[in-house]
Amino acid sequence: MDVKMTIAIRGDLKISCGKAAAQAGHAAVECVLAAMGDAKWRKWLDQWLEEGQKKIVLTADDAAHLYQLHERAKSLGLPTAVVIDAGLTELPPGTPTAICVGPAPDELVDKVTGSLKLYK
């Protein structure tokens, strides 16, 4: 069983590469912290850490799409987190920017984000 993490950044936001990278980082940290507190998720986290921490950054359409992905991940029992921007640089406070799913088995993560395109 392979495990991975996917991060989806909103494609409708016009943000800098640095901002997108920061939001992806926030998303990854939030999911790792969540996974540390759950026995099943912790197994996936430990495997993910041992195997190179595979991450894939994808594009979500908009805020509504982020929340749809988040609900799907929760319904499958996967670690997930939505990042809400603090509004200190490029975006208004409270703007949802990204979602993370995993680390979890590839086939489960793909049920949530498998149809998304790579972030550019």
Swiss-Prot record:
Could you tell me one molecular function GO term of this UniProt entry?
A: peptidyl-tRNA hydrolase activity
EC number(s) on file: 3.1.1.29
Say which domain of life the source belongs to: Archaea
Q: Which CDD domains match?
A: PTH2 (cd02430)
Cytoplasm recorded as keyword: yes
Where does this protein chiefly localize? cytoplasm
* Record family assignment: Belongs to the PTH2 family.
Output this protein's name: Peptidyl-tRNA hydrolase
Q: Which organism is it from?
A: Pyrobaculum aerophilum (strain ATCC 51768 / DSM 7523 / JCM 9630 / CIP 104966 / NBRC 100827 / IM2)
* Gene of this entry: pth
